[in-house]
Amino acid sequence: MMVILRPGPYVCAEWEFGGYPWWLQNIPGMEIKRDNTEFLKYTKKYIDRLYQEVGPLQCTKGGPIIMVQCENEFGSYVSQRKDISFEEHCSYNAKIKGQLADAGFTVPLFTSDGSWLFEGGCVAGALPTANGESDIANLKKVVNQYHGDKGPYMVAEFYSGWLSHWGEPFPQVSASEIARQTEAYLQNDVSFNFYMVHGGTNFGFTSGANYDKKRDIQPDLTSYDYDAPISEAGWITPKYDSIRSVIQKYVKYPIPAPPAPIPVIEISSIKLERVVDALLLAQSIQPVNASTPLTFEQLNQGYGYVLYTRHFNQPISGILEIPGLRDYAVVYVDGEKIGVLNRNTRTYSMEIDIPFNATLQILVENMGRINYGSEIVYNTKGIISPVTVAGKEITGGWNMYRLPMDKCPVLTEFGDNVCRNTPLQAVQFKDRPVIYEGEFTLDQPGDTFIDMRAWGKGVIFINGKHIGRYWKVGPQQTLYIPGVWLRKGENKIVIFEQLNEVPQQNVNTVRKPVLMNLK
């Protein structure tokens, strides 16, 4: 199998921050995606290290890599960042290409952009390829224009489906349309790369987000099924069969049969034996104190949650406003839930009444950094601007408790705070963030999908593996668990449930994903 490598350093791909490490934002003088000394220093480090791993695998050295991409859809960024001169954009783009060449990449280099954005995305010496281009005559016209009147002609991203956001319908593209376009490419000697041919999963906190003026942020699902020809779990679909039938007409050998289906199991009930109130974690975590709320980055935390608290010696009431919320917050006073603020719905304020000697608690979640477009440069998380009540900024006495949740919480570390998850305790913990824990035994592991339709919002760990976020708004209501992460015998599950509006005693898995249930 031959490989076309698209290494970035910017990859987009609905990945958190487009593949950039969050801590770049903490480096003084750093400006990403431009001709900036600090940024280019780190891109060079990355590319040089990348070459150590994959350089020997180029076809020029007997390996499978036949092409390497420079940057990614840079033309769209150029079109959105008119505040940066076109000359600087071109200089940056050329320097990334130069770093790839200097590192030792000798296979052909290429760029990928929408065909109408080639002017900003193309770089001398690299083949321009088009993303999402179905007009073959136009494809050949623009490639000729920017590549010396010659091909080859390639669609680097032929969209077999589309990306999915929380709170929005799951996009679908018909199998017949994909088959028709596949045949058109083959008839006209156009190379193409299905994006995606195989769906996947944004495990952990790796899913990114888009920016939208109406919704501000559009967080991506954990599932990256993409309505692809091969599903998230590796299942062939009618779309795959349609594509296979078309391709068979253009090759002189029989295409091998698809592999046998992966075993799938169903777990009818997993009892969640133990529970801990996450608001009590402040008793076991050393807080960071500041006069104003600090961002995740200032707290040296990339992902997960931060609990912001502030004690009041005098009563105060009115409108609580957090215009700089990034991205989702559940607000409590002395552990009693007051409401939810949500950047995705542009809900930044609520009525609040804080009595004498009470504590305001704000549990803030990073829902994923923007991975595409000009807003990628504004990606700090947490509370990034003043908090006000009745128009008055609340300063002094802020405590911040870091809950990164990048690793599975170990409930035994919380001592006496851990309770048996009985019906009585469930009522007591209603509307409070909790961590559930349980065990289950399997005779034979297999792929499965954990069913979260009865739950609210949170993350799940299976045998220590972070399988991602769930959220009742949908459309995704199940999370994929690869069978290789399950064991014959005892297995452990840990669930962090942020809302706990309907406390649970059990959870189950199903044999098929639920990806189109929007609430």
Per-region residue spans from a language model:
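Catalytic-core region of carbohydrate-active enzymes that cleave or remodel glycosidic bonds
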Residues: D102, N131-S231, W235, V246
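Substrate-binding cleft/loops of secretory-pathway carbohydrate-active enzymes
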Residues: E73-F105, D113-G148, G200-G208
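Glycine/proline-rich low-complexity spacer/linker segments in large multi-domain proteins
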Residues: E365-G397, N500-K519
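Aromatic- and carboxylate-lined catalytic core of secreted/periplasmic carbohydrate-active enzymes
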Residues: D220-L280
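A cross-kingdom feature marking solvent-exposed beta-strand/loop segments within repeated
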Residues: D216-I217, S223-D225, K239, P293-Q298, ...
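Active-site mouth of glycoside hydrolases
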Residues: M1-A103
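Edge strands and adjacent loops of beta-rich recognition modules
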Residues: V275-T309, M405-Y436
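Aromatic-lined ligand-binding clefts that engage carbohydrates, nucleic acids, or primary amines
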Residues: S317-Y332, L360, F440-N463, Y470-W471, ...
